[in-house]
C-alpha cells in the first residue's frame, strides 16, 4: 500500500487555558521569573525554541517589539503583548542580573550557571510549566490569531514562513467555528 502518512498537528491550547496558566505561573524565584518571561514571549510572538535561545538583550525594545533571527538567518521584528513586555522587563531588572552572576553575556535568557540557556533547557521549561511541547505554543499562537480574525498573510509574516503553504497547516478551524462562520456568512445560514 502507498498510504501517505499525515503529519500529526501539535496540540492547541484553548485561550482560556493558556491565559489561566500564564496568569497563575509562580513568579517568586529567579528561575520562575525567567520561565514566565520565556513562556509569555513564546505565546505572545510564536517563537521557535531556537529563536528564544538565541535572543540577544539588544533585540528587545522595551514593551514594544523583539528582533528575531529565524530560520535561514531571516530577521524579523515582532510586536509583543504588554504582558510579555512586562514579564521580560521584570526578568531583565532582577532575575537576569542574578543569573548572569557577574558574567558578561548578551543572550537574553540565561541558565543557572550564567551562560546561554540551551534549547534543551527551554524545551524542559515548556514541558514542566505547560505540560506540552514548545511547538504547541507556536501552533496555539497562530491558531488564536487566525481565530481572532488575523489574515493568513499576517500570520505567515509573524511566524517567519517563506511559503504560505507552510502557514496553511494552522488554518484547521474547529468544527464549532466552522458552523459559526457558516451561519454568519451564508445568506440562508
What do these predicted regions represent?
Residues 1-189:
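Conserved catalytic core of the tyrosine transesterase superfamily
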Amino acid at each position: 500500500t502507498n498510504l501517505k502518512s499525515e503529519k500529526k498537528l501539535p496540540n492547541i491550547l484553548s485561550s482560556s487555558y493558556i491565559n489561566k496558566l500564564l496568569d497563575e505561573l509562580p513568579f517568586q524565584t529567579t528561575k520562575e521569573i525567567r520561565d514566565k518571561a520565556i513562556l509569555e514571549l513564546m505565546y505572545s510572538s510564536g517563537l521557535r525554541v531556537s529563536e528564544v535561545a538565541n535572543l540577544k538583550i539588544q533585540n528587545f525594545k522595551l514593551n514594544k517589539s523583539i528582533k528575531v533571527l529565524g530560520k535561514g538567518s531571516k530577521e524579523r521584528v515582532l510586536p509583543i503583548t504588554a504582558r510579555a513586555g512586562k514579564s521580560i522587563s521584570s526578568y531583565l531588572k532582577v532575575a537576569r542580573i542574578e543569573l548572569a552572576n557577574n558574567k558578561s553575556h548578551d543572550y537574553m535568557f540565561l541558565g543557572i550557571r550564567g551562560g546561554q540557556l540551551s534549547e534543551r533547557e527551554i524545551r524542559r521549561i515548556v514541558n514542566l510549566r505547560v505540560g506540552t511541547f514548545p511547538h504547541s505554543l507556536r501552533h496555539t499562537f497562530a491558531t488564536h490569531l487566525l481565530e481572532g480574525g488575523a489574515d493568513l498573510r499576517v500570520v505567515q509574516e509573524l511566524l517567519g514562513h517563506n511559503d504560505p503553504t507552510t502557514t496553511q497547516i494552522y488554518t484547521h478551524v474547529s468544527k464549532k467555528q466552522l458552523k459559526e462562520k457558516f451561519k454568519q456568512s451564508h445568506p440562508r445560514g
